[in-house]
């Protein structure tokens, strides 16, 4: 019998085991589509970013003008720029839904995969932050000033650290050039970690909505899940296309149409929408160092989730009380996102503080306790 090159060639064999003959649980739902959508987002961002980098100039006197030049004079430059800007938003929508699915279905119990995923989230946030500075508009400049200044809260080394990142005594040309270098470099680091994420996932196999061992009920990845993923690709492309062509500035900030001016502070300094929940947590603590630590722990909290899992069941599928807590967390995060975009005044300060306490309580106290209670209820005869 003739051997199949797909199964024998050293390189094709790896691709075959990852994308063609990979045994996958038969019951994984559309919530498992977001991994492949994130890979598509990454590919789109790297391609559009590469073409933008060909025309962008990382200099404070030319950066803003070079972005205008891209939009006005470069063939389809406006389209490439809008895809890149809105693609970032879509990237975060997909990663937040991907994380939410992991929390709901207990995927965090695959510890190595989960931990690399959290590192990937940090890298994505860093990439988006330095990228937001590059157009050198008002919100780019002041957003960078506020966020980098937070590092000065660290005792003893804070001020030195801030000046080291700035490359001087204020945000200037050195800052912009290094941020451009980081923005170009970090996506390649994301690719490397994504491959590690895959590697560890394929060591254990995917989780499924029931949270049970699915070894006795596996189906090949191709054609079943390749077609399912392609449907996801089309849906996402349609959504991104509609956003880019009809509402390209919906998720941006109007302040960024004004060139950066160190002498004029915008009335409300705020980051992009996907950072607002963490920004609200930062602002809800009156102490600077406390706020910075709360900001860090709002994301680092995800690393603790596997150790706070007290339930005998893996997923939330058959746990109505924990389901209620999960959707409370989702609603709470949406409230934090809304608060992060509001001015620092009452009642927003108070709502933000309540939402921040609720956010940490749900992770650290309420969910583990309710899971323990559910175990007790299940053990009653």
UniProtKB/Swiss-Prot annotation:
Q: Which SUPFAM superfamilies match?
A: a domain/subunit of cytochrome bc1 complex (Ubiquinol-cytochrome c reductase), Transmembrane di-heme cytochromes
Q: Which cofactor does it need?
A: heme b
Q: Which Gene3D superfamilies match?
A: Cytochrome Bc1 Complex, Chain C
Subcellular localization, per the record?
Mitochondrion inner membrane
Q: Which residues bind a ubiquinone?
A: 202
Record's Gene Ontology CC terms? mitochondrial inner membrane; respiratory chain complex III
- Functional description taken from the UniProt entry: Component of the ubiquinol-cytochrome c reductase complex (complex III or cytochrome b-c1 complex) that is part of the mitochondrial respiratory chain. The b-c1 complex mediates electron transfer from ubiquinol to cytochrome c. Contributes to the generation of a proton gradient across the mitochondrial membrane that is then used for ATP synthesis.
Q: What else is known?
A: Heme 1 (or BL or b562) is low-potential and absorbs at about 562 nm, and heme 2 (or BH or b566) is high-potential and absorbs at about 566 nm.
| Assembly with partners or alone | The cytochrome bc1 complex contains 3 respiratory subunits (MT-CYB, CYC1 and UQCRFS1), 2 core proteins (UQCRC1 and UQCRC2) and probably 6 low-molecular weight proteins.
- Name of the protein in question: Cytochrome b
Protein species of origin: Heterodontus francisci
Source taxonomy = Eukaryota, Metazoa, Chordata, Craniata, Vertebrata
């Amino acid at each position: 019998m003739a051997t199949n090159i797909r199964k024998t060639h050293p390189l094709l064999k790896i691709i075959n085991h990852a994308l063609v003959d990979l045994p996958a649980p038969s019951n994984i739902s559309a919530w498992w589509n977001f991994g492949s959508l994130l890979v598509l987002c990454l590919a789109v961002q790297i391609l559009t970013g590469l073409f933008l980098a060909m025309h962008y100039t990382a200099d404070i006197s030319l950066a803003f003008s070079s972005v205008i030049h891209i939009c006005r004079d470069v063939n389809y430059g406006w389209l490439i720029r809008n895809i890149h800007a809105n693609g970032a938003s879509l990237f975060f929508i997909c990663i937040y839904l991907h994380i939410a699915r992991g929390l709901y279905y207990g995927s965090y119990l695959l510890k190595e995969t989960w931990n690399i995923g959290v590192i990937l989230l940090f890298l994505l946030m860093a990439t988006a932050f330095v990228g937001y500075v590059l157009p050198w508009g008002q919100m780019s400049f002041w957003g960078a000033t506020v966020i980098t200044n937070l590092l000065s809260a660290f005792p003893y080394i804070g001020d030195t650290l801030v000046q080291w990142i700035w490359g001087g005594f204020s945000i200037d040309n050195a800052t912009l050039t290094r941020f451009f270098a980081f923005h170009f470099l970090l996506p390649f680091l994301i690719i490397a970690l994504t491959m590690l994420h895959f590697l560890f996932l394929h060591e254990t196999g995917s989780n499924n909505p029931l949270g049970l061992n699915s070894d006795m009920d596996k189906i090949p990845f191709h054609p079943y899940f390749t077609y399912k993923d392609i449907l996801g690709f089309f849906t996402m492309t349609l959504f991104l296309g509609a956003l880019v062509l009809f509402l390209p500035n919906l998720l941006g900030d109007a302040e960024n149409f004004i060139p950066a001016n160190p002498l004029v502070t915008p009335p409300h300094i705020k980051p992009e929408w996907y950072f607002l929940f963490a920004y609200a947590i930062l602002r809800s603590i009156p102490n600077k160092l406390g706020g910075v630590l709360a900001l860090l722990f709002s994301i680092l909290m995800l690393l603790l989730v596997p150790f706070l899992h007290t339930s005998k069941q893996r997923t939330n599928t058959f746990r109505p009380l924990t389901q209620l807590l999960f959707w409370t967390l989702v609603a709470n995060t949406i409230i934090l996102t809304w608060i992060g975009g509001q001015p620092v005044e009452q009642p927003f300060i108070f709502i933000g503080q309540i939402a921040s306490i609720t956010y940490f309580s749900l992770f650290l106290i309420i969910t583990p306790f309710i899971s323990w209670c559910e175990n007790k209820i299940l053990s009653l005869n």
